Amino acid sequence: MKFYKILNKQIYISENYSIVPIRFQDKFKIMKWRNEQIYHLRQSKPLSEEDQENYFSNTINNLFNQKQPAQLLFSFLKSNICIGYGGLVNINWNDKNAEISFIMNTELEEKEFELNWLIFLKLIEDLAFNEIMLNKVYVYAFDLRPHLYRVLELGDYFLDARLKSHCKYEKKFIDVVIYSKIK
């Protein structure tokens, strides 16, 4: 397992769920899920295996030794099986805030969406607020999944902003919503 130089604690656990520094063995599962869920991601085209290899080799591999990486990514495990991934992205070390990114195995979305999101949020917030001492975390989302907002509100997030007609989606402009939590 790789380790993030910046973190004292690498693994966060809640019952049989955990987040661990992103595992290279999960890269093709992650690619599959991203391609299946491209509609709500800031990803312009499906990823190829070559794209994914390059991203892991050239971007992710370099994050582990950085003093202040722009992102901290984790494999989300249930009983040591990867069922999702995410982390803190667009980390602003000066202003002490970061965006939370998370996707899960597409097959789990229908029945375990709320559960997996809430557990992931609990784990990543522990890291964000208690390990790297951020003041604020937020979720940036295309206004396409209202069921996500309910989950965020259950996790004590508040609607921080609505960016009107902010992104083009299927030939029309849609809003972006930002849900935040302050330490």
Where is each model-derived feature located?
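Short, conserved alpha-helical segments within structured domains
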Residues: 47-51, 72, 144
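Generic structural signal for secondary-structure transition and capping sites
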Residues: 27, 38-39, 64, 133
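Short Gly/aromatic-enriched secondary-structure transition segments
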Residues: 34-35
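Conserved GNAT-fold acetyl-CoA-binding loop/helix
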Residues: 38-60
